[in-house]
Structures are given as structure tokens and as C-alpha cells.
Design a protein with these regions (language model features):
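Specific pore-lining/lateral-gate transmembrane helices of multi-pass inner-membrane transport
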Residues: 1-79
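Hydrophobic alpha-helical interface/terminus motif in multipass membrane transporters
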Residues: 31-35, 66, 93, 108, ...
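Membrane-interface helix-loop junctions in multi-pass transport and translocation proteins
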Residues: 43, 70-73, 80-115, 127, ...
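Alpha-helical transmembrane segments
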Residues: 62-70, 118-132
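Membrane-proximal transmembrane or re-entrant/amphipathic helices at the cytosolic face
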Residues: 148-192
């Protein structure tokens, strides 16, 4: 049954995408040195854009259904709706909010296309995705992200240490729940 494989692929995509999101956001204080200081004020769009791209990745995974049933026109429908949503948000809010409006436009466009593809796909070619795990991981990542960003730690080293611990919590949760390392031939002996 290939639908099980599609469901598993989606689950692990979400897990690792959230891990990357947390990693980038927790170490943004270091990663910012890869761009010039003139761009530092724009770093506030990074979490919005990253989540928007995560939604686009989920949409891309979901788009499999209309290819499998040879109804690729649905991709054109979703893309057109997403384009109209993006342009509308930018035209309405761009003059007042600048690049923040563009970031939010991308976020909402990708979220909308993801939701449309999921709900239409469940009617046309149902795949039983592990929504419980997806929401659980989004919830854990949200709590850890808020915990990592909300606590005002002045010392950069202490802040990075604290965020590293939080990222470790996510990794431990991921390993304990969905990555059975004990079943791997060589690595497994360390996790018995």
C-alpha cells in the first residue's frame, strides 16, 4: 500500500522541517553574520518566511494525489488561488507594511494552498496522514520556539546554551517517539 509510504514521508518531512526551523531560529544570532549588518532589521521575517516555506513543502508533498489520478489541473487551480491571495495581500498591505506584508503574504498563500490541497485531496484520493503526530510536533516546536525566544537572556553564550538545551529536548522527543535508534544495527547498541 503506497499510501502508507506517502503518509510516512509526510510525517518525517514535517519532523525534520520543524527541526531545521528550530535550529535556524535558535542560532539566528550566529547565522546573521552570514549577511551584512544592513540586513539585520530584516531578520524578523525569517520565522514567517520559514513557516511559509514549510507549508509550501507540505503542499508539495500533498500534491502527489492529483498527479496519481491524472488531474494535474488541480495544481493550476491551487497555484492561481495562491497567486491571487499573495498579490492581494501585497497590494493591500504592502504600501503600509513593506516587506513584512510580503512575508505574511507568502505565509498565508502557502498555508491556503496546503489546506486546499489537503481537503480536496482527501475527497479525490484519500491518504490517511498522521495528523495527530503532525499537530503534536507543531505544538512541541511552538512551545520550544516561544520558550527560546520569549526569555530575555542578555548573555549571548547563555542564550545559545539555553536554546541548545531546548533543541536537545526536541531531538530527544523526536528520537524517543519516532526514530527507533535501538533498531539500527551499529547505533542501536548505545540505545538499549
Amino acid at each position: 500500500d503506497n499510501t502508507k509510504a506517502y503518509s510516512e514521508a509526510m510525517k518525517y518531512f514535517i519532523i525534520f522541517a520543524l527541526f531545521i526551523f528550530l535550529g535556524v531560529m535558535f542560532y539566528i544570532d550566529i547565522l546573521k553574520y552570514f549577511v551584512g549588518p544592513a540586513y539585520y532589521p530584516g531578520l524578523r521575517v525569517v520565522p514567517i518566511v520559514m513557516l511559509g516555506e514549510l507549508f509550501f513543502g507540505i503542499y508539495f508533498n500533498l500534491s502527489l494525489w492529483y498527479k496519481l489520478i491524472d488531474q494535474t489541473r488541480w495544481g493550476a487551480y491551487f497555484s492561481t488561488i495562491g497567486c491571487v491571495a499573495t498579490v492581494s495581500i501585497i497590494l493591500l498591505f504592502g504600501p503600509s507594511y513593506g516587506y513584512m506584508a510580503c512575508a505574511w503574504a507568502s505565509f498565508f498563500c502557502n498555508l491556503l494552498m496546503m489546506l486546499l490541497s489537503y481537503f480536496v485531496g482527501q475527497k479525490k484520493f484519500p491518504i490517511e496522514y498522521d495528523l495527530k503526530s503532525a499537530f503534536l510536533y507543531f505544538g512541541v516546536a511552538t512551545v520550544l520556539y516561544v520558550a527560546g525566544m520569549a526569555l530575555p537572556i542578555q548573555s549571548e553564550w547563555l542564550r545559545l546554551g539555553y536554546r541548545t538545551i531546548l533543541l536537545g529536548v526536541f531531538i530527544a522527543f523526536m528520537v524517543k517517539r519516532d526514530l527507533p535508534l535501538r533498531e539500527l544495527p551499529y547505533v542501536g547498541r548505545f540505545f538499549r
